[in-house]
Amino acid sequence: MQDPQTEQSYRIAIGCDDAAFAMKDAMIAHLEERGHTVTDLSATPDEDYPDVAERVARSVARGEHERAVLVCGTGIGMAIAANKVPGIRAAQIPDSYSAERARKSNDAQIACFGSRTIGVHAALVCLDHWLVSDFAGGGSAPKVEKIKQVESRNLVVPA
């Protein structure tokens, strides 16, 4: 893994629901310490995780942020909701290998974490692995292209 201190810096959106404020705050401090620009788009008291996931994913889809991090209880709901935004590939990250592969094989722009399923230290290690990994292309490129084709065929809900 590349040294996290010498990695490229990104504009990163981050969002969480009420289950994950402590992990989100630790991630913001970690990311800013490494030179990233972080925008907190977390839930307000009247919002649920799908609202946050959509707001964060749209910011990536519009090019306002290059990467994003979403945190809820498991990371699953955030990933499902974020993946509803066209052009977004969000991955739930349970371990460092998955974090690396989410970027290298799937070109995931959004990493989703579960505050109730992974500890803060492990999540920060995974976050570093995800941030220093780049899309490898190669044999994965045609598969990511197929994901984009599936998405474009299904932008209109079938009757």
Could you describe each region identified by the protein language model?
Residues 34, 86-88, 106:
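Short, structured coil segments at secondary-structure junctions
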Residues 15, 39-42, 68-72:
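Short, conserved beta-strand edge motifs with alternating hydrophobic and charged residues
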Residues 37-49:
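A short beta-strand-loop structural module common to alpha/beta enzyme folds
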Residues 25-28, 80-84, 124:
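Short amphipathic alpha-helical segments
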Residues 52, 56-93:
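Helix-adjacent hinge/juxtasegments
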Residues 5-15, 19-20, 96-159:
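C-terminal binding/interaction regions
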Residues 13-33, 38:
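Glycine-rich phosphate/diphosphate-binding loop of Rossmann-like nucleotide-binding domains
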